[in-house]
């Protein structure tokens, strides 16, 4: 979609929401998890790799705040960091994800060590963080608008996983429940920023491209997991049966 004349705020929001057709809820890997066709290894691999994304989110949000001169925006945006890191003695989303890891049979060290993070996942997530560091704060903030589609994917896991995967412990689902309300709150703020900032056809086109970039990141993460856990072709599988890839955050 190429915008030639500036869209009204409502029409621009509709264009943003239309990008949901490319959300990773439609990826074959996620469809398999939803339908109960994923193996234990595939569920564990997803949880372990997605943890790298989870731990990068507060770094991304801190980068946005560092580039944002507006105190009112920073006061709102900081809540996203607190949601993941925790505050006032309450655990945040990262701790909740660690409990999800334990619920699917992984140890906390399995996740914290990052040894299961595939290179393709790491590259995709690092690209997101680097974009947030280098882009203007408005564009970086609006790259988070995949949150438009997040409540649906969290609810789909709550609806299907307990039925299909009774071996997953109930306490592992807290993260998905907590994000249902948090994501809706974040969407409201993010949409308001996007509609206020994108006041020309040029800016609207660029923001749609940025949202597609974020969708590409999420889709590419699942492509990497498909190669490793569905097709049994992890990196270097033709030369070794060991995990030979780098396992530390270098960026």
UniProtKB/Swiss-Prot annotation:
Entry's Gene Ontology molecular function annotations? pyrroloquinoline-quinone synthase activity
Q: Decide whether keyword Oxidoreductase is in the record.
A: yes
Q: What is its EC number?
A: 1.3.3.11
Q: Which UniProt keywords apply?
A: Oxidoreductase, PQQ biosynthesis
What range does the record give for the signal peptide?
A: none
> In which pathway does this enzyme or protein participate?
Cofactor biosynthesis; pyrroloquinoline quinone biosynthesis
* SUPFAM superfamilies listed in its UniProt record: Heme oxygenase-like
**Single Gene Ontology BP annotation:** pyrroloquinoline quinone biosynthetic process
Which reactions are catalysed by this chain? 6-(2-amino-2-carboxyethyl)-7,8-dioxo-1,2,3,4,7,8-hexahydroquinoline-2,4-dicarboxylate + 3 O2 = pyrroloquinoline quinone + 2 H2O2 + 2 H2O + H(+)
Gene3D superfamilies named in the record? Heme oxygenase-like
Known Pfam families for this protein? Answer: TENA_THI-4
Function of the molecule = Ring cyclization and eight-electron oxidation of 3a-(2-amino-2-carboxyethyl)-4,5-dioxo-4,5,6,7,8,9-hexahydroquinoline-7,9-dicarboxylic-acid to PQQ.
Xref: PANTHER family: 4-AMINOBENZOATE SYNTHASE, PQQC-LIKE PROTEIN
Concerning its family, UniProt says: Belongs to the PqqC family.
What name does UniProt use for this protein?
Pyrroloquinoline-quinone synthase
According to its UniProt entry, this protein's organism is Klebsiella pneumoniae subsp. pneumoniae (strain ATCC 700721 / MGH 78578)
């Amino acid at each position: 979609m190429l915008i030639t004349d500036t869209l009204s705020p409502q029409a621009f929001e509709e264009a943003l929401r239309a990008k949901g057709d490319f959300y990773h809820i439609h990826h074959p890997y996620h469809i398999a998890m939803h339908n109960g066709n994923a193996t234990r290894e595939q569920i564990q691999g997803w949880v372990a790799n997605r943890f790298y994304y989870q731990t990068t989110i507060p770094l991304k949000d801190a980068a946005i705040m560092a580039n944002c001169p507006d105190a009112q925006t920073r006061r709102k945006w900081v809540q996203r960091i607190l949601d993941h890191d925790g505050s006032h003695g309450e655990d945040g989303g990262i701790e909740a994800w660690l409990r999800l890891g334990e619920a699917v049979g992984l140890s906390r060290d399995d996740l914290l060590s990052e040894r299961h993070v595939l290179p393709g996942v790491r590259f995709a997530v690092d690209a997101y963080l680097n974009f947030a560091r280098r882009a203007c704060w408005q564009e970086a903030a609006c790259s988070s608008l995949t949150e438009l589609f997040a409540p649906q994917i969290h609810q789909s896991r709550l609806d299907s996983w307990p039925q299909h995967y009774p071996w997953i412990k109930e306490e592992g689902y807290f993260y998905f429940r907590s994000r249902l309300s948090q994501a809706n709150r974040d969407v409201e703020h993010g949409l308001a920023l996007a509609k206020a900032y994108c006041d020309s056809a040029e800016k609207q086109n660029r923001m749609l491209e940025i949202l597609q970039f974020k969708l590409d990141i999420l889709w590419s993460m699942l492509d990497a997991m498909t190669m490793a856990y569905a097709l049994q072709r992890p990196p270097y599988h033709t030369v070794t049966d060991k995990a030979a890839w780098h396992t530390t955050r270098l960026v």
